[in-house]
């Protein structure tokens, strides 16, 4: 078995209590104040990263990468470009989600070739079928190649799924998190990509950020959501 494989062929269906997951998701809230003195254990953090790894992405292309910003000096510099990330930067772990740009998502790009041939190890005939359907998907079905922005937005959708699963795993462990969009993308890209060289801006853009750690205060009010009958329509 290659290092890219995760054995699941012979796994039996899980028999977990769904109430446990529902409880964790109810416990979760967008934490606005983190205890900077409390750190997530290595085992708990690795479980959160495994949730990211196991997340499904469109076509299985995994068009994302994670920057885990633990350097206090870099965190301090980031504050100048993010009006809504200040509290999150005090958390135990701070993640910048990167999404790939169009140059990496062309079917013959080195990245897609790596995914198809090395990670998935697809036979040539299956890869050829992918090529045909991908051309239809990108130009007609979802028009993800209509513009650079359309490609990046599609890629970023995958990063958001990853973030959601990481946050759910954190809640399951009794940890806290907060998804963060309160920053200037251009300025933050200039800082982290161009100035600090943490990623190649030709290939990646910043999709979203998230903080993970321990709450320093309890929620001030109960969670509110629409009722099921307000957003679920059953068509029979």
Q: Which residues does each PLM region occupy?
A:
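Acidic, surface-exposed loops and disordered segments
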Residues: 1-236
């Amino acid at each position: 078995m290659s290092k890219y494989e995760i054995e699941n062929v012979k796994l039996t269906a899980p028999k977990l209590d769904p109430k446990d997951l529902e409880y964790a998701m109810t416990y979760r809230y967008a934490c606005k104040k983190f205890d900077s003195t409390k750190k997530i254990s290595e085992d708990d953090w690795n479980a959160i990263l495994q949730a990211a790894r196991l997340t499904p992405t469109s076509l299985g292309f995994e068009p994302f990468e994670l920057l885990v910003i633990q350097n206090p000096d870099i965190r301090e510099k980031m504050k100048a470009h993010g009006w809504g990330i200040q509290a999150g930067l005090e958390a135990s772990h701070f993640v910048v989600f990167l999404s790939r740009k169009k140059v990496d998502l062309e079917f013959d790009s080195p990245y897609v070739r790596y995914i198809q041939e090395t990670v998935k190890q697809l036979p040539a005939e299956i890869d050829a079928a992918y090529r045909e359907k991908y051309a239809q998907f990108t130009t007609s079905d979802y028009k993800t190649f209509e513009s650079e922005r359309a490609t990046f937005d599609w890629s970023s959708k995958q990063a958001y799924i990853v973030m959601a699963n990481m946050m759910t795993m954190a809640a399951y462990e009794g940890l806290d998190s907060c998804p963060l969009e309160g920053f200037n993308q251009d300025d933050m890209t200039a800082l982290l990509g161009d100035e600090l060289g943490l990623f190649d801006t030709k290939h990646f853009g910043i999709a979203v950020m998230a903080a993970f750690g321990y709450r320093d205060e309890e929620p001030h009010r109960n969670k509110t959501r629409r009722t099921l009958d307000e957003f679920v329509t059953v068509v029979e």
